[in-house]
Amino acid sequence: MAASLAPVRSHARTWITAASLFVVSCVVGLWVLHQTHRWPKGDGPHYAIMTSSLVNRGSFNVKPSYTSGDYIGIFSAEPLDYHVNAQYFSPDSPAWYTYHSFGLPLLLAPFLLAGEALHIPALYALQIGMVLLQALGVVLVYLYALQLIRQNGAALVAAITLLGSMSYLGLASSIYPDVLTATILVGSLLCLERLRRKPRSLLPMAILSALAGFAPYLHVKTGLMSVTLLALGLWHWWRNGRSRKALTPRGAGRGVEGGSSPLAQLACLLLPAGLLLAGYAVAIHAWYHTWVFTAPFSNGLLFHFPPGKSIIANLFDTSRGILPNNPGYLLILVGLPLWWQRDRRSALVALVVLLPSLLLQSTFADWAGGCAPAGGRYLMPFVFATLPAVAFLFAELRWAFRLLMMVPIAAGVIMGVHYTQLDFVCSYAGDLNPMLVDWLAMHHIRPDFAIPIFSHDLNLNGGLGTTLLLIGLGVALAMLLAGIVIAQRRSRSAMANSDDSQVGATALRG
């Protein structure tokens, strides 16, 4: 009886933890919202204007709002620059469509409608919507890590590492698509893992297809990620559904081993993504009169830099880098070798999905995310997808070392809370990290330690900037080396236990 109830208890614990984590994430997001200035930063007002245009005019045409200024006092305190691609629109064009993708306004439109019905200010309704959608991302990180590691506490630590980090808190409630893009990515990886354990399940395949099809709606640069995810789904279908048994009339009609048929699974993979991508292409053609749906949004920004260099900048720059601003993320580097050792297949899947998109992202001219919070918002999808490494590390260590893990996580929380409470105006690549400048001033430390390592043009600042980069590289390599040592010790321990078991079995037979 107890054994039969164990799966039920496990599922109940998972969903109770997920629901609790969602509530906590919403509370954190609302706290951040009440610490910050009223007006959204960076591209936020433009996404808000797009949402308002959709709800109030039934179109993404932003020309009436831009020209009339009806957004002033609602989404912005002052007039905005027109975020319109001049290659496609002129002042005399009857309609203007921005160079921002329209997926985020689509997701936020229901919250704006609900806000109008409940007499909630329009901007506040959109920000609450962002809090709820971003909280889903934290929950999916937990579920993805749990799917891989099968240890509730370890998966929860991975999610908390994200929730308390400065990069997440800096984006919480902000109207940027990066956390939602990361949510779609980690949700897709979760679907692939579910398919790995239930190869002929239809629901994970359909959700994977829908997520991959919707990703370009959030940002056109996710197109490569979508293609990779769909290719992995097709590879899974071919490997698990095209067996000789499945190709027989009986197998094709009823499926194999009680599962769904290969044709049904193929339909679940192709139809949602196909319909979404076709709708996206038709909309882009109607607005911009081109079937090259990347053209209106790239605006000459892609392939500006050679691949790779901006990855170093996004990792180690004192202002825009994710590692100096998020000590907890260093645990990812320690955990990666353990992930590779314990579950190489899932690690390879993540690598195949992430690496092409990361290299493409590294060619982007605006490498640091424009006017954005410190901490590298463009790398958030890659952070989400690699956070299970923290869970693998936690599961491997004993309690004393687990407590030691809490030090960088707690340091990240302190930095994130401090950054949020100071409510700095967003900054650009090459600008000083305002939080670091404030902290150095408080402790009477040389302010040039806050110098950005890289300029806006990705030039390395000499002198102290070079020294800081070398220190950062040294710390990162030390973290990776520590992970390799832990993984090797685990491997030797497993081999020793296996040898002892064989000796014991031989003695019993004797």
Regions found by a protein language model. Name each.
Residues 167-180, 321, 375:
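Short acidic/glycine- and proline-prone juxtamembrane loop motifs at membrane-interface regions
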Residues 216, 235, 239, 261-335, ...:
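Membrane-lumen/periplasm interface segments of specific transmembrane helices
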Residues 125-149, 183, 187-188:
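Transmembrane-helix motifs of polytopic, lipid-linked glycan transferases
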Residues 1-35, 39, 261-272, 471-510:
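Start-transfer (signal-anchor) and selected internal transmembrane alpha helices
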Residues 56-127, 297-305, 365:
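Interfacial juxtamembrane loops and adjacent helix segments
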Residues 149, 188-205, 215, 239-243, ...:
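Membrane-interface transmembrane helices that cradle and orient dolichyl/undecaprenyl
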Residues 324-351, 386-393, 399-410, 471-494:
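Hydrophobic, aromatic-rich transmembrane alpha-helices
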Residues 51, 158-163, 191, 203-219, ...:
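Membrane-interface alpha helices of multi-pass inner-membrane proteins
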